[in-house]
A protein has these predicted regions:
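N-terminal maturation segment of proteins
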Residues: 1-411
Length: 411
């Protein structure tokens, strides 16, 4: 960020945005640009230099370079973190067991689809038909997953888009049209797709939704990272996660109800990221109607997230080291070279993967509960409406609100 103090992106991006603003004179634009540059060079850059100096002095003084498990009361803090960030009040053991069961189910679904699909990997790369099991990081016995590398989302074409399509705007329109049957109407809003500046491409995710101000939710922006080369099915489901019916859709729906501002601060990530992941999985069926190849990709995506969530618990609650993670991934057939980056990503953000994956599992469980209670009277659109009307909340509270909305008695 400060390696090129004469050309940091906070200056160049501001200049571009001001130049594009039509309601200012040339002199006014220059004045604003000079004020911004003075603030960046006079305050922001020196502040970063001070931060760097302070952090450098702390290097080597850390008492723990592993998970929360190794801190005093680290396990208790992780339990609290999961309850707060995910909104799941179950014990870690219960959550962990559900993750394992879902991993097995997804793996078996992948096996079944690959065995029946005519355009999958060669026979030599097919997985064994042996039953899969996950009994823990140290004794996991899932068959190898290397066969999944033979399948590319770039070869899965929908009726509306080419397999290498990068038309994000058209995909968002397609998603908004196709979800109308299963999701409620929301106020008309704008959504602009932008691409991040080249100076940020190495530091940001493939895409992100920029949460709008609470008093201006009708103008929305989704940023894409061109460095990720996201296209086809991968781009489509990413846009479902960030846009329709994901973050943008949920955010606009909630804002339109004019909730108390405090609720924006109390929203657990398990609801927001769990919802976005839940509808991302839903969107796979919208791409081509649910072919075997698409279902395999959906299950593979879910399996990958579940694996990361299981490792999150392993690292922070059970105290697994980088060597443990590497051995675990190797046993599953993954390249151990990626273990280090995954380990450090999980280490820096405890319970983060659980927000996505366990949040998604909670929505799937809630949907299943309502379906069982309502039987033939269950309507998916009504369920989604009840979830969105309730807004972000811990799942124990959300279940009560949704049940009340749908007229279901929870024992």
């Amino acid at each position: 960020f400060i390696q090129s103090p004469s050309d940091p992106y906070l200056i160049t991006l501001f200049q571009k945005k001001i130049d594009a603003f039509s309601n200012l004179s040339v002199d006014e634009k220059i004045a604003y640009q000079k004020r911004n540059e003075a603030a960046i060079t006079g305050y922001v850059l020196p502040a970063y230099e001070t931060l760097i100096k302070g952090l450098t002095e702390l290097l080597g003084k850390g008492q723990n370079e592993q998970g929360l498990f190794y801190f005093p009361k680290g396990q208790a803090f992780y339990e609290y973190l999961v309850k707060r960030e995910v909104g799941d009040s179950r014990s870690i053991a219960q959550i962990e067991e559900e993750i394992k069961q879902q991993l097995v189910a997804d793996y078996q679904a992948i096996e079944n689809r690959l065995q029946t699909a005519s355009h999958t990997a060669s026979a030599s790369s097919q997985p064994s038909a042996a039953a899969a099991s996950v009994s823990g990081l140290s004794t996991a016995a899932l068959p190898a997953l290397t066969f999944l590398s033979d399948i590319s989302t770039d070869s899965i074409t929908s009726a509306s888009f080419a397999d290498d399509s990068t038309d994000a705007v058209a995909m968002l329109k397609d998603l908004r049209k196709k979800i109308s049957q299963d999701f409620p109407d929301i106020p008309a809003v704008s959504c602009e797709v932008k691409y991040i500046d080249n100076s940020l491409k190495n530091y940001l995710s493939p895409a992100f939704y920029l949460t709008p101000p609470i008093d201006q939710y009708t103008e929305n922006v989704i940023y894409l990272n061109p460095a990720e080369n996201c296209r086809g099915l991968s781009l489509y489901t990413t846009l479902a996660h960030e846009g329709y019916p994901g973050h943008l859709f949920q955010t606009v729906s909630f804002h339109a109800q004019s909730p108390a501002p405090l609720r924006f601060l109390l929203a657990p990530g398990g609801y927001t990221e769990g919802w976005a992941t839940y509808v991302e999985m839903y969107a796979y069926s919208l791409w081509d109607g649910g072919s075997d190849a698409t279902v395999v990709q959906q299950k593979n995506r879910a399996f990958s997230l579940g694996l990361a969530a299981l490792l999150d618990i392993g690292i922070h609650y059970h105290g697994y080291s980088l060597a443990d993670v590497s051995a675990f991934l190797t046993k599953l057939g993954f390249n151990a070279s990626g273990a280090s980056s995954l380990y450090w990503a999980i280490l820096q953000a405890p319970a983060n993967y659980l927000q996505y994956y366990v949040g998604c599992l909670n929505f799937q469980h809630l949907r299943s509960t309502m379906q069982q209670a309502l039987q033939e009277h269950f309507v998916l659109r009504d369920f989604h409406t009840a979830v969105l009307d309730a807004g972000p909340a811990p799942f124990s509270i959300l279940e009560k609100l949704v049940a009340q909305k749908l007229g279901v008695t929870i024992s």
